[in-house]
């Protein structure tokens, strides 16, 4: 068995040696024509493939294309696109200025304006109330109606009541009125002297002018004088004319 050669179908190119130049030129022309024919054959073979690739259908692109070229030519007169306003530099800004000293330290210009708070509104009225009875329903007390009804957890009552501080204040006022007068040392007088003076009442005559009382006044030490006599005596000496205690010029009119 004979093996078939791999280059059995290929054409053989023979080179013929010749002595004359004429023969060489003829052979060269034959070789060049052979090579040209082979080159033309390759071009013919590759032409269908190139045509096929050129006529290949492309897939349509569904991506939307937006033209942004118009955004570059914005009008500089618009308020929103004014570059002069956006990038304007304040002439009064001295933060970039340097001091004239040897270290060239930036300094800030001291502010000459005084900062004040906001002005309060003149058309708003605010009221503040202190709740001393948090267990009483305020709606029911003021209006007699409560939106929660019987399920309200606060007490439904409309009676007048007094808070603890009101009771203590009335108690102090009552004790101040009933308390017997005290002398300059702050020591209360004996009950016997107070009751005896109350039983005896006002003396018949003024101890200064020895006459009847005209517009009587009483001092802190419970001595009675005429108003005119007391003021005249007070200009010279502030002590009581009867007991000698310092009255500090204080007296109050006596009402029978």
From Swiss-Prot:
GO terms for molecular function: DNA binding; zinc ion binding. Residues 45-66 have a biased composition (Polar residues). Residues 1-80, 173-200 are annotated as: Disordered. The keyword Membrane does not apply. One of its GO terms (cellular component) is U2-type spliceosomal complex. Belongs to the CWC24 family. This is Pre-mRNA-splicing factor CWC24.
